[in-house]
Each structure stands twice: as structure tokens, then as C-alpha cells.
Amino acid sequence: MANGKRETEARWAGARWLIPVLVLVVIVGAFAWGLRTLTRATRDPGTAPTAADTSAGAPAGESSGTTVPPRVPDEWKGPHGRWHIGDWREVSFDDQQRLSAEQQAEIERLRSIGYLSGSEPVPLQSGVTIYDRSRTQDGLNFYTTGDVPGAILMDMEGHVHHKWAHGYIEAWTASPDRPELRPSPKGSGFWRRAYLFENGDVLAVFDGLAILKVDRNSRLLWVTFGGFHHDLDVMDDGTIYVLTREAHIVPSYNPDEPILEDFIAVLDGGGNEIARVSILDALANSEFAVLLNAAKPSGDIFHTNTVEMLDGRLEDKIPAFRAGNVLVTVRELDLIAVVDMDATRVVWGLTGSWKAPHQATILENGNMMLFDNRGNMGASQVIEFDPVNLEMVWTFKGDRPPDFRSRECGSNHRLPNDNTLIVESDRGRAFEVTPDGEIVWKYINPAQTGEELEYIASIFDVVRLPPSFPTDWSRRSRALDR
């Protein structure tokens, strides 16, 4: 008995050290889980929490998110990781005089970031391959393509009504305020995004280089140089909201390595900058600042790709969606956000299981639609959900995941007949689908690119113009009038 008792006491003494270790593991695990939950930010600050629905009917991302915006603890409001909120921009730093050769080289690399004109092999078919007249939305198609610095106006059968073309070097040469010309700048071979005015004028973005305006005959009206990229939105009074960026060192984010800092720039109708808001500042100054811990330490930290002015139709349900605030999509954080331009602050944000998303947009019915580039088992999908209750409304995935994929770019537009116009940029395709997911119109870009024309030219966006859109200035209309 004595020996047994001594053996039991020995075992107990040997195991005592395990108890504090197990307790410590539990505490660390709980803290890590709580921190992870905090970093998935959603909804408008001040709204009531809603239980995240993880059922099949919930939008992508609900299962990994909380509906309560993260509150930044007071102890985090000093330096934390790579960033801090207090004194965000007060560090003085002359990045032109104090940069090392390595830093200067990295800044030049970041400035040259851009998209390829094409990356997928040329398919066997091209042009309009599907056209169900009775079920498509009538109108002309205005689109930009990777093989030429220009845009095309085309009818539903693929007949070209008008073309615009104006090269970057041509615009650069004509401008007295031109910057130093970088060798073979990416983005100079095509218009990344374009906007068509009713008189035939076009606004166009050379990705990372410039924004310009040409008339219906492609004559240059004005050009503004800068890091303009991805997207623009034009107001009724001619004011332009456009994404821009700057490659530089932001000491309060990373004092050693350059970043690409994204901005929302506001231009007047002549291309003169009126204001700009840093998306980095807007996020750092907000309830969602903790998301910066998920950002890369340097380089293209955000890759913001969408800018859309809100019209206030959802303000009564989500105050952050008031008219004048701006909706953006931040690819590198898988984030949809609303920016208050006056307060320089993100006032609403949503992350989810979507991957590298593009073109979040508010629909006429108050829902939100998003091009999810890589969230469908590595393939793409378009999703529509209610931003108020986060319930899934509609998805398009194609018949099989490989059938629909665009790792980069992509766009989606809801049409008046309730069909959806989708652009699969990488594969140079655009198609119109019914609410049931049936393709009733498909266009495959006949243009090719690459040194040996081995790639189909990307289609960056297609806009279906309403039938009432005036086009009497187009070459086809003028030819028919003769």
C-alpha cells in the first residue's frame, strides 16, 4: 500500500507542470480566435449586430465574418506592427533625397505595374457566337480591348459602328507638361477603362500613366498625367472620380520599403485635380483600421479597382450609404468599402470568402453585385446579395468552375431586362445571362495580341448603351445617312 501511494504521488508530481501549460494554451488559443474574428470587418459602425448565416443561401463570406465592425482598443492606438493611427502623416521624410538605390528601383518597379494585353490562347471561335434576339437587352456595346489604345462601339451582331484610338506616346508628345518618359511603360498599349459621352467624346485611362479625353474623331482634348488606374465614374456636372496611385515610402506604414498608395482623385471636366483622398488614410482613420494588419508590408498593398459614387438609395437602411460617399473594391484585402470623402474615413466595410474581387456595384433594386475572381474553387463567379441582411440573392458560376474564370479584371452590369452582362476579361469574352443563368448573347474578341499574336486580346469592360443613347455622330450612322 505504501509503495502504491508513493507511486501515485510521484505520478501526480510529474504531471503538475502540465496544468499551467494547458491553461496557457487555452488562453493563447482564445486570444488568437478573438483577434481573427476582429479582423473580419463588416457593416456600418453603429448598426446592430446580426448573426452570420452560414447556410447555402448566405452570400460568400458570411461564414467567415462578423456583422459588428471592429473597435480598435485604446492600447492599439499607438505603434502597432507596420502602422499606427495617431500622428499618421506627421513624419517628415524627403523620399527623393534619402532613398537608397534599392528603394528607387522598387519605386520604378511599382510604377510599372500593369496588366498584360492578353494572356489566354486564341480560341477557335470569335465574334458573336450566341444571340437570342427575343431574350437579350437591345442596345449598342461600348468596350475596350487589350490590342489597341482605343475603344469600339459595336451592335449586337458584332458590326462596328465607331472606333476611337489615341496612343499614350501621341498624347505625351502633344503635352507641354509631359513627365519624363519611362521606357516601354506597361499600360501604354491600351485603354484600361473608358467612358462615352452622348456627343461622342470619350474619357480613357492609361493604367498607371494618364487620363485623357478625346472627341468623336479621336482628337486629343486634354490629358492629365499621373498614376490613374482601373476605374472612373463621371457625374452629371462633368466631375470625374478616378482611382490614382503613388509609389513612395510612407514612413508611418513602412519606413524602409515603398508601397503603392491608392487615392480617390476628384477632377473637374477639364482634367484638373480638385481633391484627393488616400484610401490608406481613410482605412487607418476608421473603425476598420485593424484590417491593415492583414495588408502586405510593402508593394501593391491594396490594388483598389473600383470607384462608384453612391446615390443615397440605401441611406435609410445603411446610413453609410448616403449620397456623396464612394464605394470601392480593394482586391488585396478582399474588401468592399464605403469611403466618406469629407471625413477621409471608411464608414462601411465587408470582407468574405471571395478572392481578389472586382467591380462591386449597387443595383437599382438596392442589392450589391460583385465579380469574384478566384473564390469559386479558384475559378470565378458573379454574386448578388442584400447588403442590409447579407442574404445571397443570385449567383452565376458557369456550368463547371473551369468554364468561367478570369484571374484578373472582369466586370458585371445588371441590364434593364434583369439580365446580367458579364465580362470575362482574361479570356476575351463578354456574355449576357438570364436570371436563370442561361447565356443568350456571347461575344469572343476577334483581336489578338502577343509577339506572335498567340493570345486573345483581353476585354476590360463592356457597357450596353440604352437604345435611346444618341449615336448620330457615329461613322456607321453618318454612312447610312448618305
Residue ranges and their predicted role:
Residues 1-4:
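N-terminal intrinsically disordered, acidic low-complexity segments at the extreme N-terminus
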Residues 7-24:
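N-terminal Sec-pathway targeting helices
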Residues 20, 29-482:
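Histidine-/acidic-rich catalytic cores in large beta-rich domains
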